[in-house]
């Protein structure tokens, strides 16, 4: 047969290869994210990384439109049923990328609330390592999936409805402890668990150096608010000053008097305590001097705006099922705090209007922050697909007392592109108007406070990074500031200034992410690509200084990890020269945009009095006309030496919250410029070697320094016995840490007070009477992060 030349416009190939070529180069990822990794995943969609080069730039809003599910972040047991449901709703063929250490294996979160790898409930094609992986790593994961599709799949027979062939994910779901190791490092010698693995604590887990002298916790200066003798007189001597307290004025009070004492403090004619800061519980059952403590202690932290400072009311409880009166009749913000205490400790509050679990699933057994509850997921039965099918969320109708026939109930979340994370809003509608709402939280609860009870004091710093995962070292600062106050550590001036500079850079970065995504929430698509470009410029500086991006874990108790690198000042100057012009561009895009303004003006209003009543802090409080900023009012970390203004706006609406954050970027730029200009010389970490690793030259000349190096390197430093609460002005509001030391190298209790928790609790006040479309603008204007909310 005579050979004929094939025309140049004809390509011969196998049908399998043609189908795989089309599928690999047009992946349709679902708009789905779980935690920190999702932010880096979304960064890969912006201009610096440009995932559109790989044909995967269009995020699909529903699982039925998508063929790629990226598990970007931690897999929580409360969220696992929804993950499985979303996966099963995707059409075939479908693929899964597990992004980040938490999704791959649980990562650093071997804790009761976290599934130890998403491959225990759904199959996975590609695992991307990192915590979080950089955008480049995610892009490599996409390329590996494309290569897998091209090389391994034979879809033609499936497409033609014939027997045989393969397409989509074919790997099995694994069972923890059966088809996968419960410890990713494998067994130790002769099958013995490795010392200090997720399976077994190291033999020397607790302190071996009680005989080492350390100074007692220092007594800090704090106001008495004119209370001398007042409570003792009014309550007949049943309320007394706690003389051992060193961080704030503290009173001991019997449980039955708590609401009356709180009501008196709130209603004082002079210097009233307008805000309930937090309700903190401590299980005292494992104290080393057990006879000195009750079974439980409940601490009420109050804030005074007139005489800036905090006050603590402390009450003691006994028994397996302790109970005290609810404070919700005095402070409405006590609602969620008391529910959390019930959920985590089993403490009941008589008279609470709706005492049920808030963070854990409704069918959870036990109370996780009690000392007898397991620390780790690997101490509990493996989580399986059957568990994910069995454990389901409460029906929406259970969140309301009465539902009329004309009422429509809708679920917004826990997976929705407009919710800024995994959270479930239950809306009660009359037409499209919101007449009531409730919030189901805890889908991002990863047991940070429980983890704090098993890490030594410095080991916990990386976990703080992942609370507000957009705020970076701001999280470190809140934690180390509280520990330093407990220990009486003096931080060198250079370290203080370095901390301020990096904290303000992260404030700008956090506000930029908020500004871009908030604009997108109300229909403006351009700003998000601009703001992420500027965020990358900040991250270039952060990476130069710390070596990390989102989670530097760079602050240390007593200072910072190391000195600033050569060239840091030039990089900072370049950014300071660049950013003001960009800020003007954002305002040109948004401030005078009639649609943007119409979507925000007068929407989601909360008054100044309501904001104080419900514990609103940060930009959201200042948007109500309240000039309250902890950097000015209760200064910390040297902020009293910097010059800046406290921006305020009137109105308390979405527009005011937008204007505040834009102006705060300007003020932060001003602070960073002062840090660059006035950076002092000297040490970058304290020379109090009881608490830090000494410099090598000091260990060679001073035996005490060498001893402290050995102790701190082997088991970590141990603060004096005591407790301390202090807070900082984080980007989203006030972030505080209440740390309790029993004199050991691990904390006895770590309480994390975050701004997102009270802000989301107050959401019904801002939402009733508005439309569903307005609701998305309202929740966007608040600026919350799910890890900050659920911890």
Curated annotation (Swiss-Prot):
Gene3D superfamilies found in the cross-reference section: 3.40.50.12280, Cytochrome-c3 Hydrogenase, chain B (1.10.645.10), NADH:ubiquinone oxidoreductase, 30kDa subunit (3.30.460.80)
EC id: 7.1.1.-
Record flagged with keyword Transport: yes
Positions of the UniProt region annotated as NADH dehydrogenase I subunit B: 1-155
Transmembrane helix is among the record's keywords: no
Chief site of localization: membrane
Annotated stretches, region: NADH dehydrogenase I subunit C: 229-384
Disulfide pattern: none
Signal sequence, start to end: none
Subcellular location as annotated: Cell inner membrane
Annotated Gene Ontology cellular component terms: plasma membrane
GO MF terms, alphabetically ordered: 4 iron, 4 sulfur cluster binding; iron ion binding; NAD binding; NADH dehydrogenase (ubiquinone) activity; NADH:ubiquinone reductase (non-electrogenic) activity; quinone binding
InterPro entries: NADH_DH_suC, NADH_Q_OxRdtase_suD, NADH_quin_OxRdtase_su_C/D-like, NADH_UbQ_OxRdtase-like_20kDa, NADH_UbQ_OxRdtase_30kDa_su, NADH_UbQ_OxRdtase_49kDa_CS, NADH_UbQ_OxRdtase_CS, NADH_UQ_OxRdtase_20Kd_su
Keyword annotations from UniProtKB, A to Z: Cell inner membrane, Cell membrane, Membrane, Multifunctional enzyme, NAD, Quinone, Translocase, Transport, Ubiquinone
Region (NADH dehydrogenase I subunit D) location: 411-791
One Pfam match: Complex1_49kDa
Catalysed reaction equations from the record: a quinone + NADH + 5 H(+)(in) = a quinol + NAD(+) + 4 H(+)(out)
Enzyme class of the recorded protein, top EC level: translocase
Membrane topology: Peripheral membrane protein
Complexes and interactors: NDH-1 is composed of about 13 different subunits. Subunits NuoBCD, E, F, and G constitute the peripheral sector of the complex.
Family the entry assigns: In the N-terminal section; belongs to the complex I 20 kDa subunit family. In the central section; belongs to the complex I 30 kDa subunit family.
Function: NDH-1 shuttles electrons from NADH, via FMN and iron-sulfur (Fe-S) centers, to quinones in the respiratory chain. The immediate electron acceptor for the enzyme in this species is believed to be ubiquinone. Couples the redox reaction to proton translocation (for every two electrons transferred, four hydrogen ions are translocated across the cytoplasmic membrane), and thus conserves the redox energy in a proton gradient.
Protein name: NADH-quinone oxidoreductase subunit B/C/D
Organism: Geobacter metallireducens (strain ATCC 53774 / DSM 7210 / GS-15)
Source taxonomy: Bacteria, Pseudomonadati, Thermodesulfobacteriota, Desulfuromonadia, Geobacterales
